[in-house]
């Protein structure tokens, strides 16, 4: 229910301001957090839950916010491909200074060619874009 409430607020704010370029639903990473160390949280949400958030975001923000980005660093490469097929519009996570998931011990690097291959494997046409979703290069 709180996810729906958040998405409604994002949708209404986007209608008023057109200020968002994309939504990136971030997966909570439990590893190496105080919540894990203090046994306050013992497991992360399931991959199915993460995919539902991506799909729900696509449905609730339709015609308001076109870009639902998939943060492959958080999802892993295979689940990121599934998320692209279930509402995600593009892969993000090529930032050179990624700290959150690196601190949790997750792999955080990939080449542009490897990301392009991931996109091709699911039948999509990869492209490199800028921050404002302008196409810089097609693969």
What are these language model-derived features?
Residues 11-139:
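Auxiliary Fe-S-binding modules of radical SAM enzymes
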Residues 1-15:
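Helix-rich catalytic cores of soluble enzyme domains
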